[in-house]
Amino acid sequence: MKIALLGNPNTGKSSVFNMLTGLRQHVGNFPGVTVDKKVGEIKIGEETHMLIDFPGTYSLYPRSKDEQVVYDVLTDPSNQDYPDLIMVIADASNLERNLFFFSQIYDLGMPCVLVLNMNDVAQRAGKHINIEKLKEAFPGASIEGSNARLGTGKERILSLLENAADKRPESKFLKGSEIC
């Protein structure tokens, strides 16, 4: 299974990648561009899966080469990096901005996991996140908290990934080619 690791810049995405892969990564480029990608392996149960760390992205409506790479991969099932599952890392202390991007990913209708990272920063700021409300807002998405910098939440994330592959939200994302 290919798992795409996505999120806004500075959400701790690389920390989650390193926590899940144990720093086992390969750096390469996406075909045709100079944007780096990191690929690592994670073990879920008895199976080994590929985790692809994509560049930090604010939106599926690309404004940079990095965002264009993410858009191209996620909207083209024939792309060699097209994922079976998407994991979005969100900064729990800045959830509104991060949920904007997650809502776009969710609307693709692909199996997805939302990891609320940096819970300690959110708590110090006096923020309490109601995960049940998030699950109501995004039915079919798997949602969990973590603090990758401290190494907490790894087993819960792996469990979510194992169970999320069969959950598929209804797609609300339309490409122009589907309409015209």
PLM-predicted stretches and their roles:
Residues 1-64:
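Conserved G1/Walker A P-loop phosphate-binding module
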Residues 32, 56-57, 92-95, 118-123, ...:
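Conserved nucleotide-binding/hydrolysis micro-motifs of P-loop NTPases
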Residues 15, 19, 72, 156, ...:
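Alpha-helical scaffold segments in soluble metabolic enzymes
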Residues 45, 69-142:
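Conserved C-terminal guanine-recognition region of P-loop GTPase G domains, centered on the G4
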Residues 120-175:
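Canonical P-loop GTPase G-domain recognition
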Residues 32, 36, 64-67, 71, ...:
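Amphipathic alpha-helical transducer elements in NTP-driven molecular machines
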Residues 178-180:
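Extracytoplasmic
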